[in-house]
Amino acid sequence: MAVGLLKAMYQELVTFRDVAVDFSQEEWDCLDSSQRHLYSNVMLENYRILVSLGLCFSKPSVILLLEQGKAPWMVKRELTKGLCSGWEPICETEELTPKQDFYEEHQSQKIIETLTSYNLEYSSLREEWKCEGYFERQPGNQKACFKEEIITHEEPLFDEREQEYKSWGSFHQNPLLCTQKIIPKEEKVHKHDTQKRSFKKNLMAIKPKSVCAEKKLLKCNDCEKVFSQSSSLTLHQRIHTGEKPYKCIECGKAFSQRSNLVQHQRIHTGEKPYECKECRKAFSQNAHLVQHLRVHTGEKPYECKVCRKAFSQFAYLAQHQRVHTGEKPYECIECGKAFSNRSSIAQHQRVHTGEKPYECNVCGKAFSLRAYLTVHQRIHTGERPYECKECGKAFSQNSHLAQHQRIHTGEKPYKCQECRKAFSQIAYLAQHQRVHTGEKPYECIECGKAFSNDSSLTQHQRVHTGEKPYECTVCGKAFSYCGSLAQHQRIHTGERPYECKECKKTFRQHAHLAHHQRIHIGESLSPPNPVNHQVL
């Protein structure tokens, strides 16, 4: 019976490798962020359970990598040696090496000595152990395979595992023997053996079948996607069924996976367990921390195959690729306009809803986009972060700087299709095109007079209101138009920017120069514009 107990405990010892899942680099690259996060959670949870049960005394390399947010495929699968790992299942195609034979003999002796300390009978134990050893050798080629019953489940056992872990908690003090004095009674051995099998059964439910067994693939009946684990298939099928069994008790939102619910609940609790060691910024998800770390490292692992542009996140790459494909999968149900990314359609939909969630805390004005609020706040702060390198003039918006720089470059990218006249700004082109169309959309509500642009209407309305917002700082005289003030100020400065090319005579106003030039071309003189005289 001592031999039976020894073999049962030796064979049923659960190792970290028994519940670990390995990925190659190619397989890891195929997983999305949520799948990688689920894998990380399961592996870390399995490790914590084995530690709490006393089944692992050293930290495996894959756990160290996962805790650092690194990819687990960096770990090469090796046969772990020592009490932490115990024996690995050896495939039928692998031969036992002399080193493995020595390890088997060493472990046999170690267990015999342990049984001796518990005063168990083992008069012929060594011979029986050698004769019956727990490796079954094939004649001729010395190949071996671990005699272990492979247990599989058709249904995932995630919800039931916790209770089973507790039921085997009495074994946590020693990975080989119970802490209580072992009494060689058949019923006690049977009870402990059953508990250990139950615990291992639950762990086996979340790992692939042993490498000794033929790998059985499970296919989804809806999309024919293939899985190696029944639990993965069960999770996947919820995509088709729409089943979301995990519900948040705070807001009622439901999820198809427990890990997604745990992540969501951190919104309510404010928990952010993942902290950046560089800047101390904290995150609710490990995947978000991994993405953030690339800000410090500058790593951009996702590269566009078309233009070779690189990105720090796969989502950014996917969004960028739509520039090349022209794909616009997000369509507005109100007007049918399509967008290449989700954030753009969310912003666009506020046009229809009138939603303006971003409010200025100084004047209370609200905006549909955060960027609009940021630009607006510079009115209050006076901030002008965009400076022209040519003349030093600063602007509150980058677009205004871009428009201004065309003064220096002379660039006029907006061309009229009717007369081929070009403009530096699209607004100027739109205003010009009304010359050809005759459109005058801006009408004065006082007199009904219409104008082709809003600035002309604004200036005209001052005729009715008598408003003169432009005041000379020298003499205090006020004007309705900014241009009129500029002309007036030349009286004080003596500036005469308009010069006749024939006689070199200068003038304060362009209209006066035009009137003067008629002397040289022989045109009849006419009195200056009365408006200009009034300005002077």
Curated annotation (Swiss-Prot):
A zinc finger (C2H2-type) spans 218-240, 246-268, 274-296, 302-324, 330-352, 358-380, 386-408, 414-436, 442-464, 470-492, 498-520. GO terms for cellular component: nucleus. It comes from the Eukaryota. InterPro entries: KRAB (IPR001909), KRAB_dom_sf (IPR036051), Znf_C2H2_sf (IPR036236), Znf_C2H2_type (IPR013087). May be involved in transcriptional regulation. Pfam families: KRAB, zf-C2H2. This is Zinc finger protein 570. Residues 14-85 form the KRAB domain. GO terms for molecular function: DNA-binding transcription factor activity, RNA polymerase II-specific; RNA polymerase II cis-regulatory region sequence-specific DNA binding; zinc ion binding. GO terms for biological process: regulation of transcription by RNA polymerase II. Keywords: DNA-binding, Metal-binding, Nucleus, Repeat, Transcription, Transcription regulation, Zinc, Zinc-finger. Belongs to the krueppel C2H2-type zinc-finger protein family. The keyword Repeat applies. The keyword DNA-binding applies. It is found in: Nucleus. SMART domains: KRAB, ZnF_C2H2.
